[in-house]
Amino acid sequence: MDKIINAVETNYKKEDIPEIRPGDTVRVNVKVVEGEGEKKRERIQPFEGIVIKIRGAGLGRSFTVRKMGADRVGVERIFPFHSPSISSIEVLKKGKTRRAKLYYLRDVKGKIRIKERKD
């Protein structure tokens, strides 16, 4: 059974995914389709924030990015690593954390400070 799953997954896996850990500041460029029919247009929309969670394995692996929007409203988006709608993922800063899930950042008001990792 595992051989069949691995054979199917190899067709859909992306190879150009950078190493991401919780606490990293990333910019995810997402392909957004606007309009319908002949007015259909595709553009790239960046989403920049801190990775607060990574879950799963294989094709089902995903990560959650949190950013502070207008009026200090927190916005979270969940991205599958191997999604065809993700154009690229850039790691802007590497964060040093002691937790795998950074849910406590949801309660923090104002600017979030995470120490930088030196790799």
UniProtKB/Swiss-Prot annotation:
What's in the GO CC field?
A: cytosolic large ribosomal subunit
State which residue ranges cross the membrane. none
Quote any Pfam family the record assigns: Ribosomal_L19
Query: Keywords in UniProt for this one?
Result: Ribonucleoprotein, Ribosomal protein
Which PROSITE patterns did the record assign? RIBOSOMAL_L19
Q: Which InterPro entries match?
A: Ribosomal_bL19 (IPR001857), Ribosomal_bL19_CS (IPR018257), Ribosomal_bL19_sf (IPR038657), Translation_prot_SH3-like_sf (IPR008991)
Q: Name one GO molecular function term.
A: structural constituent of ribosome
- The answer, when asked if Transit peptide is one of the entry's keywords, is no
Please tell me whether the keyword Ribosomal protein is annotated for this protein. yes
Q: Name one GO biological process term.
A: translation
Family annotation (PANTHER family): LARGE RIBOSOMAL SUBUNIT PROTEIN BL19M, RIBOSOMAL PROTEIN L19
- Which family is this sequence assigned to? Belongs to the bacterial ribosomal protein bL19 family.
Which purpose does this protein serve, as stated in its record? This protein is located at the 30S-50S ribosomal subunit interface and may play a role in the structure and function of the aminoacyl-tRNA binding site.
Q: What is this protein called?
A: Large ribosomal subunit protein bL19
Per the UniProt record, the source organism is Petrotoga mobilis (strain DSM 10674 / SJ95)
